[in-house]
């Protein structure tokens, strides 16, 4: 059984609405070389999926609570991208 190096952090992000449509799946994972905050993970996602940059009011929830951009994440955190709600 192989293990990843200790300094690699793997984050699982749950996707909803338009973010799910852009990525093409309900969940995506990214790996970072060190622990990261919400803003860093969001920036990496926007690099990997440039259409996410078009969403102006994208919110991030960590462990079922809206998160500030400077919140440092743990690998076991439940991360969700929440797009703006539309409709009537």
Predicted regions and their residues:
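Ubiquitin-like/PB1-type beta-grasp interaction modules and other compact soluble beta-rich domains
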Residues: 2-86
């Amino acid at each position: 059984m192989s293990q990843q190096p200790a300094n690699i952090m793997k984050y699982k992000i749950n996707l909803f609405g338009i973010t799910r449509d852009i990525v093409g799946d309900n969940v995506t994972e990214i790996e970072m070389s060190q622990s990261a905050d919400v803003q860093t993970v969001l920036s990496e996602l926007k690099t990997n999926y440039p259409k996410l940059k078009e969403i102006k009011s994208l919110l991030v929830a960590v462990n079922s609570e809206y998160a500030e951009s400077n919140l440092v994440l743990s690998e076991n955190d439940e991360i969700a991208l929440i797009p703006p709600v539309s409709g009537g």
